[in-house]
């Protein structure tokens, strides 16, 4: 009722009208299978290209189906990001079904209580590797949602509105802080329980190419290109500072000659490896070790001006 006792006038904006389809997801396995999620918590599926629909809504309080993700690995598996922030419930809700929505289960913990989830995506190469965009940043899971870990790094603490796994990168859309791209998901795809039990693990090294770059530089804002040299990524755990073990990485030619060497006991800062616990990236630009001049030979000197 309005203030004077009469009916409320519908202003026609539609904001007070619920039951609006909010998200539609077509299965990558079949164009006939389509999911539709609404802003009142209902989820429907069609398996005949839209000729008929079936209600597969999870038994939850009224909320919004913010995104739907059909697994790129299993046609019967689907994830939904569900939220109730409009009801002052800011808890994170991620649900999974392995039978086309006939039954649902809530995925695990690890996401902050007040970080409601806007989007969830599964990695296109590694099954069970999930990424979740929340109101306060990004989380990832390596065990198909049983546990979640915050994965913020240098990304601003900002609402994540969408995520896309594009080839080997994760593209992030934020609310108010532009687009961000995480280059090279390879270490996450290699990560496993077996690796976690090892004190040291070296990830697969990609092929690299040495190129000559122009001295001319474009002006203005631009994206940052990947490192043009060779990157060696490795993981260390249970590091004892008193341990005398030396960590050494050598780059060698086809005839097994050492081109460049790095070690944890090097006296040269540019050749020294940090042995702190965690993930590390060693970069080699293709330059080789210098040589020592014979005694009595002086290097050339010159000036320009």
Where are these regions (language model features)?
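Short loop/turn segments at secondary-structure transitions that flank enzyme active sites
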Residues: 185, 209, 240, 255, ...
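Glycine-centered tight-turn motifs at strand-turn-strand junctions
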Residues: 258-305
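Short, glycine-anchored, charge-dense loop/turn motifs used at functional sites
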Residues: 144, 253-257, 305
């Amino acid at each position: 009722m309005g203030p004077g006792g009469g009916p409320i006038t519908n202003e026609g904006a539609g904001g007070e009208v619920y039951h609006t389809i909010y998200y539609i997801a077509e299965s990558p396995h079949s164009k006939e299978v389509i999911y539709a999620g609404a802003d009142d918590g209902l989820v429907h599926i069609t398996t005949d290209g839209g000729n008929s629909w079936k209600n597969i809504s999870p038994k939850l309080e009224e909320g919004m189906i913010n995104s739907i993700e059909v697994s790129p690995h299993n046609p019967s598996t689907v994830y939904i990001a569900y939220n109730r922030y409009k009801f002052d419930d800011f808890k994170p809700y991620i649900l999974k079904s392995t039978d086309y929505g006939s039954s649902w289960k809530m995925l695990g913990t690890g996401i902050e209580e007040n970080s409601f989830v806007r989007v969830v995506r599964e990695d296109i190469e590694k099954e069970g590797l999930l990424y979740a965009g929340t109101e306060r940043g990004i989380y990832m899971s390596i065990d198909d949602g049983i546990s979640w870990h915050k994965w913020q790094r240098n990304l601003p603490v900002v609402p994540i509105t969408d995520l896309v796994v594009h080839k080997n990168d994760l593209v992030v859309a934020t609310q108010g802080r532009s687009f961000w791209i995480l280059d090279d998901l390879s270490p996450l795809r290699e990560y496993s329980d077996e690796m976690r039990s090892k004190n040291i693990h070296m990830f697969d090294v990609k092929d690299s190419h040495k190129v000559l770059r122009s001295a001319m530089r474009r002006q203005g804002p631009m994206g940052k290109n990947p490192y043009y040299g060779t990157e060696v990524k490795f993981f260390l755990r249970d590091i004892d500072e008193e341990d005398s073990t030396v960590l050494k990485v050598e780059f060698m030619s086809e005839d097994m000659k050492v081109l460049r060497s790095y070690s944890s006991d090097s006296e040269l800062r540019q050749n020294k490896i940090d042995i702190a616990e965690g993930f590390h990236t060693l970069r080699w630009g293709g330059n080789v070790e210098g040589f020592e001049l014979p005694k009595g030979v002086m290097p050339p000197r010159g000036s320009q001006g």
